[in-house]
Amino acid sequence: MIEEHTKIHTEEGHMETFITFPEEGGPFPTIFFFMDAPGKQEELHDMARRVAATGYYVMLPNLYYRSTEHFELDFETFSNSGEMFELMSSIGNRMIVRDALTMIELAESDPNADSQNIGCIGYCMSGPFALSVAAAYPEAVKAAASIYGVRLVVDSSDSPHLGFNQTNGEIYIACAEFDDYVPPEMVTQVSEELSNSSANGRVELYEGVHHGFAFPGRGEYNKEAAERHWERVHALFDRNLK
């Protein structure tokens, strides 16, 4: 596997990005792997590697680059959780859509990347980012996955559900049964909004598990659910990008 750390130059700063892809067989379909709130840490690098190993060019950017070059939540003491919440509140869907354009441009310039077949995946904070990017760039983004994504249906002009009709790619939304950030009524609402739109996709409720079930280094990890999510994500990307 090839791995590199690069800085993508945007109009708002320098976005440090982890890129990984196989040594042979390219160009590879491109995956935008958007980090969750605790930051771009090694756990996410490993998850990006898992996707890349199946034949993808994966980009994992630091979405907090406007404020800091690097942030990782201290999971032992949570002493910097206040900073995390400040960083979370400093970014939004429109910002990430702008960032995604620079990521597309980088992919276009790299012969190892297939920039015409892009998939997006986001977890928690970044679930709505993945869906928003898919709606903003419908010709390039062929698949998008939100894994226990928050704020998918909100009273805002950039709410992700409003982009369903503009999305050409297939959508997959995974929700945990027990989730303090995603109440059952939002799961029902996003399911209805997706069903009533022109988008191709589905919402799947993972019964018996909690928000965060896919992260192997965290307390809510559930191996069975995590592996099911990987099965769904790999199938989604293979079906639409290869």
Residue ranges of each PLM-predicted region?
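N-terminal cap/leader regions of alpha/beta-hydrolase-fold enzymes
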Residues: 1-242
